[in-house]
């Protein structure tokens, strides 16, 4: 438990919701969701995504929050407080801590890319560049080890400085401000995209149901993609959101709070597409997926756009907030784990964490240049690809399966205790009739995602 035996808590309900949503909202909301939606039939994919968000993402989110709120600690401490005597569920707490560290070993580098591009647009570095030159900027950045390491270290130090100021004075205060600014920025960017000449065509491609695209991909593939997206968008399974449950009060039920987090996460993901597709269609540029969408396709769009320097800077400021909100949220979990497992105070946990992650982030930052010969997943792969594979394909689904089994089986905490914690407070309740689904169907769905990710 907390070394001072006095658990910190959020200063407001809004703080909890915005910080938790900030943890869930990240780079994948922007560079994956819109493209997958367009690829798999537009509105058809969105409907399947929302269905599986309710069937899979929301239940596991309530489980992480319930374990945190009832156990009043980070993953390992919470498991130990709730597990039956003699059981070893708390061992998963070490995997949660390792998962958060591994995630930050590459996420800090990618967040640094966002800051780099924000300053490039702000200072006019893209002004007058041809499409080929604009595309080449990304490769030049990746090949520069000093630049890559510099921004990774800046993000790492900034994150621990924020968390070092405490839960309310640091994480909650900065998180609320940053998420509020993020939501304003995304609305401004959406409105601007709607004014572009090809906006209608882009919006139709993105949101209107298109059975030909869906059947062309195969309906089974559409459903599988929707399952994956709804599950991974919340970053469940490594205790990243569980820690915020431990800082909650019991005034409101967990299904209601989890639903609010899901709504914010989905809102940002959908809005990202409302920005990207009208812009790409207006300038006849095909939207890609992943880093190439953010760092090659969109800079080309902005350089062709009236006032592109401003709109590019605002977009990458939005991306900086989206990524950094995840960084500080996961850092808080790492700090809490270190405090509870090793008995450190917050200052020591921040100092050691900052030094450790600055070093542990080097393989990813140098994996595109000095250590580019290291290709752990085969030719053309990078250290980032390998680290992301371990987190996304192993630790997230595997950890979510552990949380689920802990909350619904008699060998763990048990369904009745889980639902009692879920339903404490005012708001929507978790009904008892979901028990068979949680015990016999949901584990199979998560296992399918886990196995599929390993194949």
PLM segments and residue spans:
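Helix-loop junctions at the membrane interface of multi-pass solute transporters
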Residues: 32-37, 159-166, 229-257, 261, ...
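Transmembrane helix-boundary motif of multi-pass solute transporters/channels
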Residues: 14-52, 239-245, 256-259, 263-264, ...
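Inter-helical loop and helix-membrane interface segments of multi-pass membrane transporters/permeases
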Residues: 4-8, 36-40, 70-95, 108-168, ...
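Helix-loop-helix connectors at the membrane interface of multi-pass transporters/channels
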Residues: 1-3, 77, 111-143, 246-251, ...
